Regions:
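Active-site catalytic pocket residues across diverse enzymes, especially alpha/beta-hydrolases
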Residues: 84, 106, 110, 138-139
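Short internal beta-strands
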Residues: 41-46, 143-150
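Conserved N-terminal glycine/acidic-rich loop preference
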Residues: 91-130, 152-174
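Active-site acidic carboxylates
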Residues: 1-91, 112, 160, 164-167
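Histidine-anchored nucleotide/phosphate-binding helix
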Residues: 30-35, 129-139
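A generic structural signal for short
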Residues: 20, 65, 120-121, 150-151
């Protein structure tokens, strides 16, 4: 069985940048350990915005410029990037919370073989839950897991709410 790890938005702006949190900083070690020990394919997502961010729907609701492509904040956290240095992985630049391309990329990797998917990263309550639900909707019979020790939300409360939502949608939360 193929195993796929989706590392969601472990970018500087979400870890210790303009939208960073203490909880996000605290999970970096767990994320690095997960990447280092994972035996399977890895997909890394990048929240990707441009100079017009504040004029977008998201920018109007969250008027904090972040993950602008080409800026330091768009780059992966340096420890996460180091963990990926010797690994083969695919990247997905997503323009919104969830990637509608992600299921097709998983399909290319698995080519009809049995597989499982594990998601880790930031933010539990926005991009992790969005991508987990997109994958579960696309592959309802596949084991989709979220490792809560490798995730952090905007707040601890919304992190826990997202974990509950995913459990209710038959996503395994460990």
């Amino acid at each position: 069985m193929k195993k796929i790890l989706v590392v969601v938005d472990m970018q500087k702006d979400f870890v210790d940048g303009v939208l960073g949190t203490a909880e996000a900083v605290q999970i970096v070690g767990n994320v690095v350990e997960k990447i280092n020990s994972f035996d399977g394919e890895i997909i890394v997502t990048y929240d990707t915005h441009f100079e017009n961010y504040l004029n977008t729907s998201e920018g109007e609701k969250l008027p904090v410029e972040h993950c602008i492509k080409g800026t330091a904040g768009w780059n992966l956290d340096s420890d996460v990037q180091s963990a990926l240095e010797n690994r083969k992985y695919r990247t997905v630049e997503k323009l919104t919370f969830g990637s509608v391309e992600l299921p097709a990329i998983v399909g290319e990797i698995t080519k009809g073989e049995e597989f499982s998917v594990e998601l880790i990263g930031l933010c539990t309550d926005i991009c992790v839950v969005s991508n987990a639900l997109i994958l579960k909707a696309s592959y309802p019979e596949v084991s989709i897991t979220v490792d809560s020790s490798c995730c952090a939300g905007v707040t601890p409360e919304t992190h826990n709410s997202a974990l509950t939502t995913m459990k209710m949608c038959q996503i395994n939360v460990i």
